Amino acid sequence: LADYKGQVVLLNIWGTFCLPCRDEMPAIEKLNQAMAPKGLRVVAVSIDEPGAEAKIRSFAKEFGLTFQILYNPSGAMENAYQTTGVPETFVIARDGVIRKKVIGASDWNSDGNRALIAQLLAERGR
């Protein structure tokens, strides 16, 4: 994620096996479509077991996902962000500070979430 330094990032940790993850993906894609042109970077990190690459590709195709999807079966991402399950999502400001953390599914395309992201996009790095 160091590649995204200085950018506003929505980091979603998920798995193909997770029903709430399936529920929230369409809203994440809608948010991405609306806010990526303004500078938001959406990164979804799958924590599926080793060997799940085809499953992950199929999931992304099924939902028409256009944002970056990473695969981290080692557990390093869960350790780094001290997650307790999936989905778990972080909104990270340009300065690298986590501004919002949500455990469980959320409507990421809601007015409140879009307003937060718009505010963070308007802020310049500190």
Language-model segments: what does each one mean?
Residues 1-9:
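A short beta-strand-turn-helix
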Residues 8, 25-28, 114:
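Short amphipathic alpha-helical/adjacent loop interface patches that line ligand
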Residues 124-126:
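Non-globular targeting/processing and membrane-anchoring segments
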Residues 22-63, 73-80:
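Structural microenvironment flanking redox-active thiols in thiol-disulfide oxidoreductases
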Residues 58-66, 71-119:
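Thiol/disulfide oxidoreductase modules built on the thioredoxin-like
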Residues 9-11, 43-45, 90:
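Conserved hydrophobic packing residues within short motifs/helices of P-loop NTPase cores
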Residues 12-18, 47:
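Aromatic-flanked redox-active Cys/Sec active sites in thiol-based oxidoreductases
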